[in-house]
Amino acid sequence: MNFMKFVFLSLSLLLWPAIAAAEARVPVDAGWLALGHYRPSRWGDTYVSTIDSENFFLSKQGKTSPEAELLATIELFSNSGNEEQKCLLPARYKYLKKRGFKLAEFPKCEELEKFYDDLQPSGVTLLFTDAYMNNPSSLFGHTLMRIDTGRKGTQLLAHGVNYGAFTAGSENSVLFAVWGLTGGYFGGFTVKPYYDIINMYNNIENRDIWEFNLNLTPEELDFFVAHLWEIGHTQTRYYFFTQNCSYMLMETLDAVRPELRLADDFPAQSIP
C-alpha cells in the first residue's frame, strides 16, 4: 500500500508541470492574431507582429508569441491596478469580454473618453486619392480612412485616419526611395481633422478623392475606434511595397472583422 502511494505521488510530481502548462494555455484564435497584427513568420509554424513598438506588448515574448501576449493581457485585466496600461488597450479588453473572460472593471480613462468625444463616430469611409507625381511616395495614389462624425452638418468636421512614414522631409529623392524600400523609416497612424486632409489633397495638390463607405455594425465601429487608439501609440517599419498605407489599413480592418483576412491576400506586396 505504501509502495502504491509512493508511485502515485511520484507520477503526480512528474506530471504536474505538464498539467499546469496545459491549464495555462488559452486558445489563440484568428481574432487575437489580427488584434496583435500577427503574421506567419518565415520560419515554420510561428508568428511575428508587424508592430515594432515595445510598449504595445505586455509580455517580453509578445512580438513573436501571441499566446504569451494573450496570457499577459488576461493577467492585466483580471487584476486591479495598472490603470494607465489598461487605458492604452481598450480593444483588448473588449475582445476578452466577448470571449467570456471574467475581468476587473475597466478603469475611467479621460484621454480615451476625449478621443471618442472628439470623433463622435457614426461610420467609417475608405478613401483613395489620385497619384501625385511631385511626391515619390504618392506615385500610386494613397489610401486612408475617414471616421464619419455623428455631428450634424458637413463631414468636414469628421476625422481622417492616415498611415504613413515618418520622414525628416529633407531627404533627396534617391535616399527617400532607398529608405522607403528597405525599411529605413518607421511608420505610424495619425488622426487629424478631415478638413485638413481636404485642404491638402484637393486644394493644394489638386487630387481627387474617391470614397467607399464600409458597412460596419455599431459594435464593429466601436471596436475599430478602440483599436485605432491602441495602434495610435505605436510604430511599425515602413516598406513602400509591403507594409504601406494600404496594407496597414487592411490589417486594421482584419482586427475588426477577422474573417475578412484581407492582409492574407497580399503576402508579397500591396500597391498603395
Question: Predicted segments — roles?
Answer:
Residues L175-S246, V256:
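N-terminal accessory/precursor segments of enzymes
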Residues T129-A131, T149-G150, Y163-A168, E219, ...:
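An acidic- and aromatic-residue-enriched active-site/binding cleft used to recognize and process polar
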Residues Q120-N206:
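Glycine-rich catalytic cores of cysteine/serine-nucleophile enzymes that process amide/ester linkages
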Residues A22-P107, F212, H227-P272:
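Activation targets extended, charge/polar-rich intrinsically disordered C-terminal tails
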Residues V7-W16:
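Bacterial N-terminal signal peptides
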Residues F115-G123, P136-S138, H142, N215-L228:
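Active-site-adjacent bridging/hinge elements
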Residues M1-F6:
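Positively charged n-region of N-terminal signal peptides that target proteins for export
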Residues L103-E111, A131-Y132, S138:
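Non-catalytic accessory/assembly modules
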